[in-house]
Amino acid sequence: MSLSQESGAHHDPQDYPVVSDEEDEIDILGEDDSCSLKSHFYLQPTHSEMGDSGILSPSKLSCTESESDSSGESEGGTSKDSPATPSGGKAKRALVKPPYSYIALITMAILQSPHKKLTLSGICDFISSKFPYYKDKFPAWQNSIRHNLSLNDCFIKIPREPGNPGKGNYWTLDPASEDMFDNGSFLRRRKRFKRHQQEFFKDGLVMYNPLPYYRPYSTIQPQQVLQQTPVACMAIPENLTMPTHLAPYPDIKRKVPYPDQGVHRGFEALDADNHPNKSQSKCSFSIENIMRKPKEPEPSFSTFNPHWNYNHLLQRPNSCLLPAVLNLSTGPLLSNAQGTRQYNLIKFPGCY
């Protein structure tokens, strides 16, 4: 009893907060270390750890239970929450994104179709049914499929037939893009496919078949223009020739624009030499004037010098003539005192 009184005399209540400071430092070390230190310093539970009913406080119980839990986990090998972890892992593994690009997915969808063509909705349905990852995230990647169809040359748009009801155009693969993937594996593309426009639009013209100006994606050379378009030549009397396959149209009332003033004056001088009296030889080349004056010498294209017969310049009523184009690629057809020139009159469509 004397020992207890002495201990009570030497220890006043102000010394107890020191224990709380030690507990704070132990919490920094960790929960397991705090329990081991308490068991080392306190052989018996103190009054503060005992409740009013004489039961250990929850902090003490937690230390004892932690030891039993750790031993139980080591023996059983599994924790209480172990069944929930594998199920969550399986769910995550099922939603892993497939290792295929959008081009590969579109190619898979088109190749599995019976007619080797599908609409945008058909492609999306195939991808959703084949890969659960895209099924759960359907609205987000549909625009990516649409952009890949439009921006890649390996996909060709096919318009829907008039008698085939439905919405949207069909999409198919370019025949030249069959070797786009290595050994038929969709994991990697060999190279990006680019369509050659000259082969795709081969022998096709957008506008005006006689002229190659509107041929898409091709370089037009001057020699090709002269070879593919009908050309009428107009030259000085010594070297002027007329194409024989062009038929004259004497009943056309159309004025021909002369490209060069010197050539125009040459025609006027020739008319003055062949017809001194212009008032008598002037004619409008109409059927009425021919019927009214049957006895007068009628100037026609046959009476002129055959080298100066230029009625072939008017070939069709709905055609017109461009100004003469200077071309030095072929032989000289125009010659005068100063030099040699050649004029080609190229027919231009769509003029009225």
UniProtKB/Swiss-Prot annotation:
CDD domains the record matches: FH_FOXD4-like (cd20048)
Compositionally biased tracts (Low complexity): 73-82
InterPro entries: Fork_head_dom (IPR001766), FOX_domain-containing (IPR050211), TF_fork_head_CS_1 (IPR018122), TF_fork_head_CS_2 (IPR030456), WH-like_DNA-bd_sf (IPR036388), WH_DNA-bd_sf (IPR036390)
First-listed, main subcellular location of the protein, grouped into a coarse class: nucleus
Superkingdom of the source species: Eukaryota
Region feature Disordered, mapped onto this chain: 1-32, 47-92
Keyword S-adenosyl-L-methionine: no
Keyword set, alphabetical order: DNA-binding, Nucleus, Repressor, Transcription, Transcription regulation
DNA-binding region: 97-191
GO biological process: negative regulation of DNA-templated transcription
Organ and tissue specificity: Expression begins in the newly forming dorsal mesoderm and is maintained during gastrulation at the dorsal blastopore lip (Spemann organizer). At the early neurula stages, expressed in a row of cells along the dorsal midline that are destined to become the fllor plate of the neural tube. At late neurula, expressed within the anterior and posterior poles of the embryo. After neural closure, expression is detected only in the tailtip, the otic vesicle and at the midbrain/hindbrain boundary.
Its job: Transcriptional repressor.
Protein name: Forkhead box protein D5
Species for this entry: Xenopus tropicalis
